[in-house]
Amino acid sequence: MVIIISGTPASGKSSVSKALAKKFPKSVYIPVDDLRAMVIGGNIAPWDDKFGEQYKLIEKNFLAMTKNFLEEGFVVIIDDVIADEQVKKYQKMFGNVYGFLLLPSIETLKKRDLERDSTGEMHGRIDVLYPEFANSKHDTLKVIDSTNHALSKTVEEIFKQLKNSSH
């Protein structure tokens, strides 16, 4: 099984992914931001127009990792900003893929961003991505409004939906 946790910066993707991974006896967490950070010379920011080519390489790597872990019986949890079309593509590749979009309010996102070890530097990305996610129809990603959720509640909601989907 592959579980994709998507959302804007500060939506809780990493925290939710790590906590969710602990609910499975054999799981792996793939933070795509960490793969992006491996590129030192020639690193292109995700909001740069030229990022698409670099993302293809990053995607190629996290999909290879996904395949390898699946072959060894792991549940794979991927944390990235991923749209419905990508989830559909991954479903065709791996079959058993579930996508979740964490979509707290924009005010909550900005508050969380300031609480992180940052200066609110991702506010601009939040301003761009939030309307895209909030105003799109999602037929593959299941939307979770985690505005007033504790981490454990968001994880339980996802876990419950996964259990219901696998029957």
Identify what each model region corresponds to.
Residues 5:
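Hydrophobic anchor at the beta1->P-loop junction of P-loop NTPases
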Residues 8:
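P-loop (Walker A) phosphate-binding loop of NTP-binding proteins
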Residues 11:
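ATP-binding Walker
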Residues 14:
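Walker A/P-loop
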Residues 18-61:
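Conserved substrate/cofactor phosphate-moiety recognition/catalytic segment
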Residues 54-94, 98:
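Glycine-rich phosphate-binding loop used to anchor ATP phosphates in small-molecule kinases
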Residues 94-113:
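Conserved phosphate-donor/acceptor-positioning beta-strand/loop module used by diverse small-molecule
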Residues 115-157:
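Small-molecule kinase domains that catalyze NTP-dependent phosphoryl transfer to phosphate-bearing small molecules
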